[in-house]
Structures are given as C-alpha cells and as structure tokens.
Amino acid sequence: MAECRASGGGSGGDSLDKSITLPPDEIFRNLENAKRFAIDIGGSLTKLAYYSTVQHKVAKVRSFDHPGKDAEQDHEPPYEISVQEEITARLHFIKFENTYMEACLDFIRDHLVNTETKVIQATGGGAYKFKDLIEEKLRLKVDKEDVMTCLIKGCNFVLKNIPHEAFMYQKDSDPEFRFQTNHPNIFPYLLVNIGSGVSIVKVETEDRFEWIGGSSIGGGTFWGLGALLTKTKKFDELLQLASRGRHANVDMLVQDIYGGAHQTLGLSGNLIASSFGKSATADREFSKEDMAKSLLHMISNDIGQLACLYAKLHGLDRVYFGGFFIRGHPVTMRTITYSINFFSKGEVQALFLRHEGYLGAIGAFLKGAEQDNPNQYSWGENYAASSGLMSTAPELCPTQRARSGTFDLLEMDRLERPLVNLPLLLDPSSYVPDTVDLTDDALARQYWLTCFEEALDGVVKRAVASQPESVDAAERAEKFRQKYWGKLQTLRHQPFAYGTLTVRSLLDTREHCLNEFNFPDPYSKVKQKENGLALKCFQSVTRSLDSLGWEERQLALVKGLLAGNVFDWGAKAVSDVLESDPQFGFEEAKRKLQERPWLVDSYTKWLQRLKGPPHKCALIFADNSGIDIILGVFPFVRELLCRGIEVILACNSGPALNDVTYSESLIVAERIAAMDPIICTALREDRLLLVQTGSSPPCLDLSRLDKGLAVLVRERGADLVVIEGMGRAVHTNYHALLRCESLKLAVVKNAWLAERLGGQLFSVIFKYEVPAE
C-alpha cells in the first residue's frame, strides 16, 4: 500500500489526514491517468479536482454471422457475449486539511505519469499563498481563477447534474433532511457564501450573475470572537461548544424585558431581544458553551435577515447557503434556517448543498476545461467511490472519521449521452420518480435494507458464476461484498448520506459497486440462454393469439405482458422458483397471476379505450430479457402495429440484473423480424423504433432520459406511454403524472410489498390513466 506522510521542513509527520482513513492509493484513485487539475485552497481545507480516464470491463453482445441457419433448429445461443475493455471519463474530488498540503503534492507528483496538462487552475485565498509550492512540486503553472465565478459555476453544475443535491434542514423533523427534486430550470437563485465574511450573489443564468451585497460579519467573526471568548482556537471545536450551550443564559429575551406583555406585541417570549444582553448586568461567569451558542445565534440571525432582505428585494424565493461556515454542521444549518423562516414568514427557502464544499474546485475545473465543453455532457454521482453526507448524530458508522467538512471523497462519471426530461411529463418541476422515500418511512427502510443484505450472498454467487474463466473472480466478488455491505451499514445509520434513500438508490449503489470490481453484467449468460429459449416459442405464442377473437385477444395480450414480467431475477420469490424448477415457463407464470379483479384493475377502462380511435404513437419502457420482452412485450407491440400505431421501444443503455439492454433488443428484434412479417415490415418502414433510455438501473427516472429518445417522442407525437415492471412502474413512477394516456403494469413479486399494498404475492397492478382535461 502506498503511504503518504505529512511533511514539515522536510521531516515526516502524521498520516495524510485525520478526516480520511482510506489508504492514499484509494483516495487518489486513477491518478496515473489524470488529464487536468484544479484546486481550491481555503483557510483550513484544500479541495483537489482532477479529470481522469478509467478503464473497466463491459459486456458486449453481437449477433452470429451466419444468417442462413434456422434459429429455431440449431442449439446455439442467439448471440455471442464478449467482455471488452472500455475507457470512460471520471471526475475526482478530494478534500484534505492544509496541514498536509506538501505531503499530498509529493504523492501526486510521484504518481503522475500520463498527464499532458501544463497548467493547474487554482482558486480560493490560498491560491496565492501556496502558488510557489504547487508550481515547484507539480511542475505545473498555476492559473488563478476568480473565486466567485468558480463558486457559481460549481453551484450550477451540481444543481443540474446531481439529483437530491439541495436540501432543507429541519432539526425537529424526522428525517431532519428534506431533499429537493431536480428542477428543470434552476435559475434564478440567491447564493450566500459564508466564508470569513459574507458574499451574496444573484444568479440569473449560466453566465450572468451579480454580486449584490455582503457583510463583514461572517464565519471569521464567529471564529475570531469565539476564540477570544472561549480560548478555543479550532473552528469545529467552537461549534461543538455551541451545540451544547444554552443561549438564553447569555442573551436577553423578549420575555426578560416585557414579561407577559410580550403577547400583546404579537411576539414570542423566547425571541432574542439583545444578543449577550445579560452579560453586562449579570454578576457571574458564563460558560464557554453558552457564549459560543449566543455568538452563533447572533451571527446566523444577522446573515439570515440579510439574505432574506436581499431575496425579497430581488423577488427570489430560493437561497442556497455555502462556505466553510456551513460545512454540514447541524447547529449552523438550524440557526440559519430558523432565521430565514422567521424574517421571511416562510416565503423564502433556506437550502443547503450536499457538495457545497466542492463548489470552488468544481468551478475552477470547469473554467480550465472550457475547451472540452464539459457542460455538453451529463454527469452522475458514483455512489461506490463517494463518501456520504455526514451524520448529525454521534458517529455510528463503521468507518470512523472526524468531521472536517461535508465530504471526504466525491467521484462523478461522465455519461455517454446527455440526459433530459421526458417531454410528456405533466409538470417536470414537481415530478418525483420514487414512490416511497425510505428516509421518511422507518419501517420500509429497515425492511429494504435487510432485504438487500440478505440478497448479498446470492449476488456474490451470481457474479462469480458469470466469470468462470477468471482466476480472481472470487476475490473481486468478496471485495464487492465488503464494499456494498459497508454502504448498507452507513445507510442504516445515515439514511440521508446520498440524498433521498429509495429502493432505486439501493439498486443503483449495488450496480455501481459491481462495476467497481469489474462485474459489468452478472446475468449476461442467463439472459442469453433465456432469450434463446423464448425465441423458439415466439411463433407458437403469436399463432395462438391470432386464433382468438378480438376482445379475447386483448385480455390474452395483457396477461402475456404480466406473465412475462414474472421473470425477474431481482425478485427473490422468482429467483428461488427459477433456480429450483428449470422447467418453469410462460404458461406456469400465467397460472401464478392473481385472478381478476386485480389489485389495481383498470382493464375494463383500457378495453373500452381500444374500441375508440387508435393512438398515434406508443412509447414502451421494457423490463426483462427472455420471456418478458419476447413473449410478453413483442406480441403486444405487434398488436399495436396492426392497429396502425407507431411504437418506440425503449430499453436500458447498460445492464442491470436481467433487464433487457438496447443492444440485446436489437438482436432479439432482428431474430423476431426473420420470423414475423409484421415486425419485419414495421422495422423496415421505421414504424417500430428501438431506442436506448440513456441509463442502466432497474428503476426509471423520467427526468433523466436520453436526449435522442426525447427528440423522437416529440417528432412522432407519442400519445401513449406504457411502463412495465415493479422497478419502473411501482418503485418508481406509480404516481407520475403525464400529459398523455399511460399504462403502468407489473406483477408484485415481493410478499412484504404486496401486503403493504393490500394484496398478496403475484398480485397484479394494471393502471390505465387518462390526463385530466
């Protein structure tokens, strides 16, 4: 393991950073491939940003090149699978104390091998202080960037790219953190940066912002006066004192002046009438804790009132707070929130950011990378490699680390394609993908965390089995187990660590951890086999459907969709059956389905709609490979095509569980077209279009879809959206409101969830919705 020692005057010192307990080669990951650097040096903390390329394995599928063979007769799979190396881009952000600046620069210099850059962008007050040291150690020219410009660019970046970035802090609520959904238009807003002093900036667009005010009374005031009053020199220790203090012992309250008469003034007796008002007349010593608390209230109330006045003056209702004074400290966030609520009478929101400590570093990086146009891409937080928002409770997490900021590590992956809202969302600004917020529902949270823990052995076993020729598969799988288990324990004690905790985020985190240890598609061979078997049955299924009368066929098609959706390897109730009974197939799945009336049953309403004029274009979000896509979805697609309806079939861009991927759907469609003239003609005439969603998870976020898909939806005038599967239609989007008609259908394959919804295992949800006029 590489070591990194603090150095002072050339001699060794303590370990890298008390706040980072990971070994240096895990902190400075992919440093050897770093292409561009930026650094934000504050009064006590340094934030380093660098862009690197990451090489990892991806599973690729390719159709066999012998079309003359009869796919139904031969016993070979429908396509071949290969694992290839792929290079992607990643942003790394690291926070460490300035004490260890020289040691970290030495480590970076010793491990830089492939960098082409000759410049490092620098911002923050320390950019001047450490300029010569950085240039000497890294042999890179320091380009100093404007602090405020960097902060604004960084703030815009995280608000656009990271879901649940902003939150309100409500101390007496459960949960304390209320995360905001991503708003499609983040402008305008007020940014209040509380460093040594206070800067207040109105941000109107990506490039237009204006410094509109500020104050000399800020974090430096709290630190300086606090040190004089308490003899405590460390900022974090001062805040700890404040958290234990009672300000009413030092402050003069309204009730101290007016007694019971304060009610006639319409004021609360507990309001502060005079900060430190009792200290002039009291004949006793005050505790350090009480003085620190009084000082914190005085400064926070002043900043809150100032921010509120500027927000009102400029007609703004969103105020984001950042700077070293905040840094995720609950006592600070609580006092600022109270102040904003009081002075604005609840009309202005005080919002904080999960990554506010990195805004300057992100902005400096973006300034240096303008020629690469990083804003043309979408970026996603990598949960496997990032630290979480720190606990406000006593430290319970297995990974012990002292508080020195909101984050220790942050990594963001560049996504292949830009992501946008589905144009058919009724109101993108109020859209919430997830049905249940597990940070808000303690019972559901404990159940799902336990559920994912108990499933871990099976995931590890499947990962190892997917790479039988790899000599280190078992070792990597064990590392995956340890990392994901650690994430689950963190989330047990800090459910807000990565924003709103949901089933979707638990699944995403698991996929990120699998990819981290080069298990890109553990179910690739399962999907290959099931696709091959289902293709052999396709013609018999369509012949059976064609023999039915119209009304009988519509119900059979829906039951086929539902039966296909049973085949979900992510559901333990199903995977147990599939592993114990290899003969379990399409007909057996139909018999598992709940009899009508279903748990949610809009089928009669749907049938009545089918008797009317046909839709123009249907957008279908498919779920699983094998029987689901081939015997459930494609016959349904075929029926829509026969009605003259165009179809856009959207599948995941990358693998997760046994969900069908876009590349697999292309091969499946090609094989089906060779057997079915309706599908063949529709593909040739572009009436059936296969597209990728732009994402990989088993759930579906309609606010982050491939831009090409959104363009196609507009061009084709889609007026029906079909979402199938538990992940896409129950865990997410169950309450999603669209501008057009929608079908949400799934089989509930989890007994606990089914009971909670008022049903039983294999209950059916068939939800047909028409938008209100």
Curated annotation (Swiss-Prot):
Induction: By glucose.
In-chain residues carrying the UniProt-annotated modification N-acetylalanine: A2
Keyword set, alphabetical order: Acetylation, ATP-binding, Coenzyme A biosynthesis, Cytoplasm, Hydrolase, Manganese, Metal-binding, Nickel, Nitration, Nucleotide-binding, Phosphoprotein
Reaction equation(s) it catalyzes: (R)-4'-phosphopantetheine + H2O = (R)-pantetheine + phosphate; (R)-4'-phosphopantetheine sulfonate + H2O = (R)-pantetheine sulfonate + phosphate; (R)-4'-phospho-S-sulfopantetheine + H2O = (R)-S-sulfopantetheine + phosphate
InterPro entries: ARMT-1-like_metal-bd_sf (IPR036075), ARMT1-like_metal-bd (IPR002791), At2g17340_3_helix_bundle (IPR035073), ATPase_NBD (IPR043129), PanK_long (IPR015844), Type_II_PanK (IPR004567)
The keyword Phosphoprotein belongs to this UniProt entry's keyword annotation: yes
Residue numbers carrying Phosphoserine: S404
Enzyme Commission number(s): 3.1.3.-
Record-listed 3'-nitrotyrosine modification sites: Y320
Compartmental location: Cytoplasm
Subunit annotation: Homodimer. Interacts with PKM.
Family: In the N-terminal section; belongs to the type II pantothenate kinase family.
UniProt-recorded name of the protein: 4'-phosphopantetheine phosphatase
Gene: Pank4
